[in-house]
Amino acid sequence: MHFNELRISQDNRFLIIDVSVDNQDYFEDVLLDSIVIDTQDTFVMNGPSDNPLYIYNVEDAYDLTYSLPEQCNCNPVRVEEDESYCFTYGTQQMKNVRLELNIQDLKVSPCSTMFFVYVKSKGTPSTDTPCGFDKDQILGTVINLQPIYKQTLKYLKEVECDCNIPKGFIDMILKLKAIELCVRTGNYPQAIKYWNKFFIKNNCKSPTSNCGCYG
């Protein structure tokens, strides 16, 4: 399995999850089973937790209505009435899922939430599956980078104005890299600690600049 897309939309309204079963012959009998979302408040090692933010069972979704292919990126598709869900079907049934979850409905902040997205599969890969490729669960982590991106633009304007790199810019990059390294190495508890310490209170604030010529 792999994520085709895992991000928060630019308008901060939606958590977008697009996932597929790998397109190799040895995964012919493997289907997507469920998507479970934890946050920094519910995360546990070897998750998902017993009280996740959100659970989505793929099989249950196949009572949904159909829509025209041009209404969604999938081809062909079927979606729920509110067009939050998009699926392929037929020979690829339950091998591709796209969710666009309204973050307001999830009752969490788009700026201060670290999402842990688990995708589970069902079915058995063939016996010739390479070692390490037969996992039945993957985990993706996502935060809202839009506020950080906007703050970066402000800092870059300061660089243009003063020809000096602001200390706040360096500080922000180091903090973000610390979280990224923790996630990449699987040290999620430490990533959560850094997220809560460095970003959770400030990520929703409007960016500021000390550059007088840009205001």
Swiss-Prot record:
Keywords annotated in UniProt: Viral tail protein, Virion
Keyword Nucleotidyltransferase: no
Superkingdom field: Viruses
Major subcellular location class: virion
Keyword Acyltransferase: no
Subcellular location field: Virion
One annotated Gene Ontology cellular component of this protein: virus tail
Subunit structure: Heterotrimer with THB. The heterotrimers further assemble as 12 docking hubs that anchor the trimeric tail fibers.
Biological role: Forms the tail hub together with tail hub protein B (THB).
Protein's name in the database: Tail hub protein A
